C-alpha cells in the first residue's frame, strides 16, 4: 500500500514540477505560477482538497515515466475569505494551459460537484484552449456542457468569480462571459472570440491582442470585465474581497454578519457634502464613505458606465449593495446597474439606493446605443428584485431616474429623504425652456411672437415646478417615509435593514380571517 501511495505522490509531484519549470518565464512576464496564485487565494492554514489530480495520466503520453497528470487543470475545494469554494485553475505552466486528455472530463466533474454541493465557483483562467492537434469532434460537442453548467450555476444562485490571468479565447471566452464577476489583469488578459491571426484569416481585419480583448478595453468599453488589476497578486486580492461579499449567502447564515465598525470618515461632514442649490456636482462616494463600515466600499465596474456607481459594503456589520449616481444614467450605466441588482438578488444582499439623479441620458447617440432598452432592463430589475430595497433621496430625483433608482412607485421597503431632496418629472428650468420652445414655435406658425408672454410663461413654470419639488411638499404628500438628518443616514439604514431581516425570519400563523372581538 505504501509503495502505491508513494507512486501517487510522485505523480502529483511530477505535475507540480512540470508547471514549476516555467517559473523563470512567468517571473519575467511579472506573473505568478498557477499554484502560487492558488496559494494566495486560499485562506492561510485552511485545508485544501485537491480533486482529480491524476486525470489524463498515460493518456497524453503512453510512456508512464513521461506522462504528466492533471489534464491541464488544478482543481479542489478550499476556503476563500472564510467561504468554502470550488476552485478551478488553468495550469498554464504546462503547454500554455491548453486542455490535455481527460481535461474536459475533469472540468465537467468539478462543475458537477459544485452544482450538487452549492459551492461558490472561482475560476483562475489562463488557457490556450483546446489542443487543435488532438481535436476530436465528440469532445467539441460534449464541451458545450461546460457553458450550460455555468449558466445553471448562476441561475441556481451559485456565485461565479473569474480572474482572467491571460488568454481566454474562442469558446473559452464564454467561461468569462458566463461569470457573475470578472477580474482582469492589465497587460495580460486576452478575451476574444477570435485572436488576431484567425480574425485576419476570416475577415481581413488587422487588430492587436489588446485592441481585441485587453483588460483596459473590456473594463471600460465592452463591460465584460468588472474589476481591473495591475497584476496577478492584486487580482487575487480583489477576488478574496469579492468573495467576502458574495460568498456568505451560500454559507451558514451565522457567518454573514461581520463585526460592525464605524466609518473612518466623519458623518458630521454630511451637512456640507450635498449642495442645496443642486447645481454643484457631488461625488456620492463621499456620502458612501460616511455611511458604511470602515468607509470600505468595493466598487464594481468603476470604468464602465462611470456615472452610475455600484458596489458592496457593510452597514452595522451586515452586507449591502449600494447604487448611486454621479451624473445621468447612460446605456452602460443602466446595463451595469441591472447586472449588479441581479447579482445582489442572487446572493440575497439587500440593496440601498442613494438618489442624486437628473434622469437618463438623452440624444441621438444615446438612443442609438439603446438607452430605452437598457433603461427598461434596469427598471425591470428594480421592480422584480427579491431582496429588501431601501432608498434615500439625497439630492435630485428627476424623471425616469426616480423610477430606475427605486422611487416610491417601485415599492422600496423604506424611503427617506434628506432636506436637500428634490423630486420632479424634470427640473423647473428644463420644463420652462421646453414649454417656451414649444409655445414660441406655435407663435411663429401663426406669425405673432409675444416675447413678454413667453417671459412670463417661463417664470411661472419655473415657480410651479420649484414649489412642488422640495422636500416639504413631497413629504407632506407622503411621498417618503420621513425627512432625516443626513448625519443619521447610517443609523436609519441599519435599523431599516434589521426590520426587514427580522420580518423575513419571523414565523407567522396565517388564518382565513382576522381575530374578531367577542
Question: Which residue stretches match the model-derived regions?
Answer:
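Ligand-binding clefts of soluble mixed alpha/beta catalytic domains
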Residues: 1-518
Amino acid at each position: 500500500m505504501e509503495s502505491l501511495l508513494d507512486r501517487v505522490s510522485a505523480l502529483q509531484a511530477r505535475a507540480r514540477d512540470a508547471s514549476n519549470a516555467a517559473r523563470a518565464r512567468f517571473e519575467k512576464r511579472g506573473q505568478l505560477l498557477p499554484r502560487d496564485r492558488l496559494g494566495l487565494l486560499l485562506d492561510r492554514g485552511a485545508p485544501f482538497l485537491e480533486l482529480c489530480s491524476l486525470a489524463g495520466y498515460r493518456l497524453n503520453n503512453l510512456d508512464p515515466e513521461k506522462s504528466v497528470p492533471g489534464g491541464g487543470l488544478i482543481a479542489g475545494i478550499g476556503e476563500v475569505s472564510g467561504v468554502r469554494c470550488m476552485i478551478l485553475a488553468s495550469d498554464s505552466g504546462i503547454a500554455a494551459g491548453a486542455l490535455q486528455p481527460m481535461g474536459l472530463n475533469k472540468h465537467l466533474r468539478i462543475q458537477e460537484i459544485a452544482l450538487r454541493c452549492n459551492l461558490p465557483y472561482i475560476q483562475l483562467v489562463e488557457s490556450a484552449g483546446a489542443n487543435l492537434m488532438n481535436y476530436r469532434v465528440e469532445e467539441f460537442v460534449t464541451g458545450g456542457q461546460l457553458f450550460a453548467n455555468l449558466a445553471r450555476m448562476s441561475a441556481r444562485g451559485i456565485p461565479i468569480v473569474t480572474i482572467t490571468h491571460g488568454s481566454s479565447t474562442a469558446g473559452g471566452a464564454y467561461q468569462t462571459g458566463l461569470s457573475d464577476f470578472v477580474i482582469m489583469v492589465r497587460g495580460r488578459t486576452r478575451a476574444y472570440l477570435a485572436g488576431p491571426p484567425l480574425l485576419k484569416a476570416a475577415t481581413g481585419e488587422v487588430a492587436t491582442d489588446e485592441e481585441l480583448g485587453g483588460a483596459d478595453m473590456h473594463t471600460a468599453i465592452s463591460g465584460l470585465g468588472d474589476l481591473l488589476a495591475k497584476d496577478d497578486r492584486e487580482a487575487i486580492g480583489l477576488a478574496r474581497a469579492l468573495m467576502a461579499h458574495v460568498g456568505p449567502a451560500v454559507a451558514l447564515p451565522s457567518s454573514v454578519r461581520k463585526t460592525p465598525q464605524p466609518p473612518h470618515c466623519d458623518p458630521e461632514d454630511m451637512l456640507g457634502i450635498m449642495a442645496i442649490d443642486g447645481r454643484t456636482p457631488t461625488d456620492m462616494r463621499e456620502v458612501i464613505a460616511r455611511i458604511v463600515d470602515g468607509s470600505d466600499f468595493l466598487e464594481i465596474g468603476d470604468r464602465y458606465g462611470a456615472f452610475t456607481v455600484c458596489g458592496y459594503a457593510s452597514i452595522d456589520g451586515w452586507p449591502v449593495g449600494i447604487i448611486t449616481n454621479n451624473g445621468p444614467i447612460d446605456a452602460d450605466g443602466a446595463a451595469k446597474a441591472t447586472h449588479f441588482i441581479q447579482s445582489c438578488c442572487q446572493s440575497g444582499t439587500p440593496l440601498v439606493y442613494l438618489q442624486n439623479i437628473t434622469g437618463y441620458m438623452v440624444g441621438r447617440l444615446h438612443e442609438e446605443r439603446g438607452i430605452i432598452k437598457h433603461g427598461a432592463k434596469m427598471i425591470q430589475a428594480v421592480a422584480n428584485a427579491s431582496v429588501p430595497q431601501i432608498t434615500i433621496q439625497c439630492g435630485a430625483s428627476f424623471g425616469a431616474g426616480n423610477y430606475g433608482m427605486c422611487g416610491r412607485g417601485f415599492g422600496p421597503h423604506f424611503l427617506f429623504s434628506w432636506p436637500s431632496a428634490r423630486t420632479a418629472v424634470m427640473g423647473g428650468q428644463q420644463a420652462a425652456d421646453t414649454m417656451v420652445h414649444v409655445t414660441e414655435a406655435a407663435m411663429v406658425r401663426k406669425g405673432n411672437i409675444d416675447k413678454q408672454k413667453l417671459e412670463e410663461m417661463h417664470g411661472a413654470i419655473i415657480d410651479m415646478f420649484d414649489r412642488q419639488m422640495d422636500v416639504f411638499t413631497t413629504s407632506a404628500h407622503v411621498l417618503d417615509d420621513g425627512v432625516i438628518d443626513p448625519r443619521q443616514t447610517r443609523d436609519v439604514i441599519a435599523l431599516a435593514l434589521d426590520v426587514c431581516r427580522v420580518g423575513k425570519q419571523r414565523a407567522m400563523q396565517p388564518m382565513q380571517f382576522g381575530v374578531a372581538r367577542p
